[in-house]
């Protein structure tokens, strides 16, 4: 499972920053995707969540990841409790060179590349929403 492997790869980052990752998988289907590209998407999302939690000094940090199937698609939901993205800029976060990071550690390319990988290389869709706790990314990928 690529999500589990990616989260294992990032376990040091999560441990270092006291982030609990909850993962619920309701799918056993396989996808025809570029594995390394999808792994990069999950790394981008996890790193952004971690950075936001640190910058906003969030306590009891968590990332919830769930997968499920619906209508011949695999859905991956990636949610954090980092307080969300300001309404003024949420529509711009997939734009190239756009970054919300105040410390200038962001290039503004991570989410742009993630959207390109999901939508142009994998035939899927990625959307972002604010929740009561933070931000939720929903990725939809076609099942083979």
Regions of interest found by a model, annotated:
Residues 1-144:
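Core catalytic ATP-binding domain of two-component histidine kinases
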